[in-house]
Curated annotation (Swiss-Prot):
Role played: Capsid protein 1, together with capsid proteins 2 and 3, form an icosahedral capsid protecting the viral RNA genome. The icosahedral capsid has a pseudo-T=3 symmetry with a diameter of approximately 300 Angstroms, and is composed of 60 copies of each CP1, CP2, and CP3. CP1 is situated at the 12 fivefold axes, whereas CP2 and CP3 are located at the quasi-sixfold axes. All these proteins contain a beta-sheet structure called beta-barrel jelly roll.
Modification after translation, per record: Specific enzymatic cleavages in vivo yield mature proteins.
Molecular function GO terms recorded: structural molecule activity
InterPro entries in UniProt: Dicistrovirus_capsid-polyPr_C, Picornavirus_capsid, Rhv-like, Viral_coat, VP4_dicistrovir
Protein's UniProt name: Structural polyprotein
Organism for this UniProt entry: Cricket paralysis virus (isolate Teleogryllus commodus/Australia/CrPVVIC/1968)
Keyword entries, A-Z: Capsid protein, Host cytoplasm, Virion
Keyword set includes rRNA processing: no
Pfam families, A to Z: CRPV_capsid, Dicistro_VP4, Rhv
GO cellular component labels: host cell cytoplasm; viral capsid
Family: Belongs to the picornaviruses polyprotein family.
Recorded coiled-coil stretches: none
Site note Cleavage, residues: Q283, A284, F340, S341, Q635, V636
Length: 895
């Protein structure tokens, strides 16, 4: 017994010395021994709910998510009838504008990350007698892309190409937009302020008119709240409440003297100082033998992550006697059509080196580039949802289906029956001068931007007319499609609209009408030519040869005269938007005639711009048809509203103006072209020059290349800069990810006047991808995407990724740069001076990567120098994401 007592005492003693661990939320207790616990009362019971119901209470528990989901007012201002079309009434950066609210700050204190769906609502306090239309616009990650935002907001076409919604006073008093969080940051960093939701803009789409006088104002309110809130990880650091990145950049530019007078004027005017369709995935580890055996990078799409469906319908070949190899219903061949088609060769080197520079113009086949990555099969995976949607936004049908603002006209009570209010050429080449007085810079739509880079077009075009009216306006319009009639100068006589396909719109029941104009032509294809081009003239008639590129006109006429009650305005504004139909297709990709422009869009005096727009859109001259037509029979009547942007990208299109069904037909490609273009991913695989005539003149010097850099658009009226297909389509998107392929052709010249010859010595190609001293020493010498410098020995001999290439054997210097990036997506920013700064790299504006090309030869400025040109195209794992606007354009210099 005595022995047992000693054992028990020893056991109790060990219990007292044992470490006890307990986790209470964010606090972890570790203590030694037993922790006594007691209660204040012998038996604790919960009070009856009947007892608690005697006072105010509710069943729900208020969490942080509940508080953040409560809408708050972020702005209340006046919309005046003096505010012209395109004026920006309000803008706000998120989540900064929410965090500036004391309640939001209190609830978010103590956390590092915030991720949520942003909901913005705009309300107006309008009267039934007022008419006008507002546009709510959104740009993701806008604070980090100020130069892109400037391009977007220069034109109404650019704004309308972004995610937008309209507020029409005659049918409602509020609109709402739900915005998912899409950013290179998985969470908004509440402590550092990194990773933004983006910016919203409230813009005048149609001028406010108030009663007969046409003057007045209404109050608008902007609400915002968060849904699906996810806050992450506790911290004791304070929440960032400073200025957003674009404000910082403005301050820095002012401090350095780089802020221009024009930018200051815009800053003052816009008051920015105040305030289940397509799922396509990249293949992993594509092998040469699979490509040879199956004519596809993948055996049976076994390498693709999940699945592949497409809005572009698989063709029914019908009575085509022989089917070309590229027309196939196999998923592997469909993947090729969408651009997953040009893998880097991973077979034996000797198999293809006799044609090292082959297939530079092709989107498919094989690429011979040396991989600069550690793995010879390096390739990132593309998954759905990285940009907030499962759609493949590089599918051309997605791009073409986006409605863009195109034109506007006025319908007055004085316009009598048969007055022609508006004509428009049926062509996808929707590119026009900025105004009646500024004719050397151009506005554009998504459809026109694509047509600008092709030879042929065919397919339907969608027209939408939005009537800015009140409930006290009435009248009818006749909208006709007249094939192969253009105008009184080119065409003979007056068209008999009683024989045409038409839609009749009753203003009492419709605020907008949308319809599809089918492709009508005697040839399978028409040319992509701007209808106003000078070479379409013949016999002193402008546009006499227009029938080669335009299928006819859409004409809007008065059927029943506009009637306005005495207490409403005597005219209405009609807005026209255009987009591509379900079968709109292009063929023969080529160089664009017009390129993005970032320069001034005004004359010497910017105050003339309002007068220019008034002149462009005015409808003061009556254009009447004197010949009366017989009784009119409408083919289609009713209220056919516009298909919203999101639904249009899912393949939904409005009814046709006639009765036949519009569908895809692959025969025109099979019979006339020999290939089918369905994706921008195909187009950007074509190599193009991005650095030309670069010269090494100092012994020991090397070329330094920033492979991912895209320079800002030209600011001059005579553009001479190089554009690859990648560069051209870069301006349509907010984000990108993936590898880049670079090819260099180098020639030597022994003295002035001697012929050039291909280099016959080896080259050392090195990749620097770490933001450390060596990288900093290289980037500090760069002022463009391609520059030259003498590499210090300490830089080149420290083990960077190196390839030794002999062009006498391989033809070209060809390398592929991996997407070594800090985040899963990269914002599509542009750099004014060509090369990002170290701060740009730290922000994630570009993957940190510089290539150096060093010749194994002696160089002399007078006796032996080297001239090189650089070409690039994205790798097979590359994707653009989040469709945005189209930039203003300028014609390419050809003198």
């Amino acid at each position: 017994a005595t022995f047992q007592d000693k054992q028990e005492n020893s056991h109790i003693e060990n219990e007292d010395k044992r470490l006890m661990s307990e986790q209470k939320e964010i606090v972890h207790f570790v203590s030694e021994g037993i922790t006594p616990s007691t209660t204040a009362l012998p038996d604790i019971v919960n009070l009856s709910t009947n007892y608690l119901d005697m006072t105010t209470r509710e069943d729900r528990i208020h969490s942080i998510k509940d508080f953040l989901s409560g809408p708050i007012i972020i702005a209340t201002n006046l919309w005046s009838s003096s505010d012209p079309v395109e004026k920006q009434l309000y803008t706000a950066n998120f989540p900064e504008v929410l965090i500036s609210n004391a309640m939001y700050q209190d609830k978010l204190k103590g956390f590092v990350g915030l991720r949520a769906t942003l909901v913005v609502k705009v309300q107006v306090n309008s009267q039934p007698f007022q008419q006008g239309r507002l546009m709510l616009q959104y740009i993701p990650y806008a604070q980090y892309m100020p130069n892109r935002v400037t391009l977007i907001n220069e034109t109404l076409q650019g704004r309308s190409g972004c995610p937008t919604t309209d507020l029409e006073l005659s049918v409602g008093t509020e609109v709402e937009m739900r915005i998912p969080y899409v950013s290179p940051h998985l969470y908004y960093n509440l402590i550092t302020g990194q990773g933004s939701f983006g910016s919203i803009y409230v813009v005048v789409y149609s001028q406010l008119h108030d009663q007969v006088s046409g003057t007045g104002s209404i109050e608008y309110t902007v609400w915002a709240h968060l849904e699906d809130v996810d806050v992450q990880y506790p911290t004791g650091a304070n929440i960032f409440t400073g200025n957003s990145p674009n404000y910082l950049s403005i301050a820095e530019r002012i401090a350095t003297g780089d802020f221009t007078e024009t930018e200051m004027r815009k800053l003052w005017i816009h008051k920015t100082y105040l305030k289940r369709p397509a799922r396509i995935y990249a293949q992993a580890a594509k092998e040469l033998k699979q490509l040879e055996t199956n004519n596809s990078p993948s055996t049976a799409l076994g390498q693709i992550s999940e699945g592949l469906t497409t809005l572009s319908h698989i063709p029914v070949l019908g009575n085509i006697f022989s089917t070309p190899a590229w027309i196939s219903a196999k998923a592997a061949d469909l993947a090729k059509l969408f651009g997953f088609s040009k893998p880097t060769v991973q077979g034996k080197i000797g198999e293809c080196k006799l044609r090292g520079q082959g297939r530079m113009a092709n989107f498919d086949g094989m690429d011979m580039s040396h991989k600069m990555a550690l793995s010879s099969t390096n390739e990132i995976e593309t998954k759905e949802g990285l940009a907030g949607t499962s759609l493949d936004e590089m599918d051309l049908s997605r791009v073409l289906s986006i409605p863009n603002y195109w034109d506007r006209f006025t319908w007055k009570t004085s316009d009598v029956t048969n007055t022609v209010l508006w004509d428009n050429y049926v062509s996808p080449f929707k590119v026009k001068p900025y105004s009646a007085t500024i004719t050397d810079r151009f506005r554009c739509t998504h459809m026109g931007y694509v047509a600008n880079a092709f030879t042929y077009w065919r397919g339907s075009i969608v027209y939408t007319f939005k009537f800015v009216k009140t409930q006290y306006h009435s009248g009818r319009l006749r909208i006709s499609f007249i094939p192969y009639y253009y105008n009184t100068t080119i065409s003979t006589g007056t068209p008999d609209v009683s024989r045409t396909q038409k839609i009749v719109v009753d203003l009492r029941t419709s605020t907008e009408v949308s319809f599809t104009v089918p492709y009508i032509a005697s040839r399978p294809w028409l040319y992509c030519i701007r209808p106003e081009s000078s070479w379409l003239s013949k016999d002193n008639k402008d546009g006499a040869l227009m029938y080669n590129c335009v299928s006819g006109i859409v004409r809007v006429e008065v059927l029943n005269q506009l009637v306005a009650a005495q207490n409403v305005f005597s005219e209405i504004d009609v807005i026209c938007e255009v987009s591509g139909g379900p079968d709109l297709e292009f063929a023969g990709p080529t160089c664009p005639s017009y390129v993005p422009y970032a320069g001034d869009l005004t004359l010497a005096d910017t105050r003339k711009i309002e007068a220019e727009r008034t002149q462009e859109y005015s409808n003061n001259e009556d254009n009447r048809i004197t010949t009366q037509c017989s009784r009119i029979v409408a083919q289609v009547m009713g209220e056919d509203q516009q298909i919203p942007r999101n639904e249009a990208q899912h393949g939904v299109h409005p009814i046709s103006i006639d009765t036949h069904r519009i569908s895809n037909n692959w025969s025109p490609q099979a019979m006339c072209i020999g290939e089918k273009i369905v994706s921008i991913r195909q187009l950007i695989k074509r190599f193009g020059i991005f650095g030309d005539a670069n010269t090494l003149q100092a012994d020991g010097s090397s070329f330094v290349v920033a492979p991912f850099t895209v320079t800002s658009p030209t600011k001059t009226l005579t553009s001479t800069r190089n554009y690859t297909q990648f560069d051209y389509y870069y301006y349509l998107y907010a984000f990108w990810r993936g590898s880049m392929r670079i090819k260099m052709v180098a020639e030597t010249q022994d003295g002035t006047g001697t012929p050039r010859k291909k280099t016959n010595f080896t080259w050392f190609v090195r990749m620097f991808n770490s933001l450390q001293d060596s990288f900093n020493s290289l980037i500090s010498t760069s002022s463009s995407a391609v520059t030259t410098t003498v590499l210090p020995s300490g830089t080149i001999n420290m083990g960077p990724s190196t390839q030794v290439i002999d062009p006498t054997v391989e033809g070209l210097i060809e390398v592929e740069v991996p997407y070594y990036n800090i985040s899963h997506i990269t914002p599509a920013v542009t750099i004014d001076d060509g090369t990002p700064s170290m701060e740009d790299y730290l922000k994630g504006h570009s993957p940190p990567c510089l290539l150096t090309f060093s010749p194994r030869d002696s160089i002399s400025a007078t006796n032996h120098h080297i001239t090189a040109s650089f070409m690039r195209a994205p790798g097979d794992d590359f994707s653009f994401m989040y469709l945005l606007e189209v930039p203003p354009l300028v014609n390419v210099a050809r003198a």
